Amino acid sequence: MNGLLPEELPEGRLLLHSCCAPCSGAIVEALAEAYRQAGRDPGEEMAIFWSNSNICDREEYDKRKAEILRYAREFGIEVIDDDYDHEEWLAQVAKGREDAPERGPRCLECFAFRLARAARYAAEHGFGTLTTSLASSRWKSLEQVDEAGRRACEAVGADTRAAGQAAGSTGQTVQWWGRNWRKGGLQPRRNEIIREQNFYNQTFCGCEFSKGPISQN
């Protein structure tokens, strides 16, 4: 059973920020199925944005990226690879928040950092809606993810309105789709896809501060 109805789909093109293949698998499958049911080509209607500079080393980053690239190919969906810059992430997100707990202020700013990059890309490339697989993980605060996504899209809207006024046009705005991607049977389907695809399933979120047993964070 699909966890998404065709009428729930956004009208314009959708950009899905992917944090990893395990969290994205059921979302991509549900979106692709809903688009097909609506008579729309998922390869034309959506793309995946890979922006995860929180990951603490390049080898880990590339390993996770390879999995989402492999999976997206099955659906004919493009993956946009954002620049990897962990040093910038450390400076902008982690500095002064190194000792913050998981689900604390560092996590909120991490989501904001990554989703701001996704929102800017969406605005610049004609995507009208942004969502993220971060909202599928039970280890993440849905409230933080939603706040970061709304902030990112509101900031892009303010920038494009200002630029549009200067240029005499309205500019491109991006809507935030703050869906709970755990519902509609997607959580158990997520776990099934991990096994079916034999995904590399990491044991920590990505940054050096998130390493260690989750129960200790």
Where are these regions (language model features)?
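Nucleotide-activated chemistry modules centered on ATP-dependent adenylation/adenylyltransferase
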Residues: 1-217
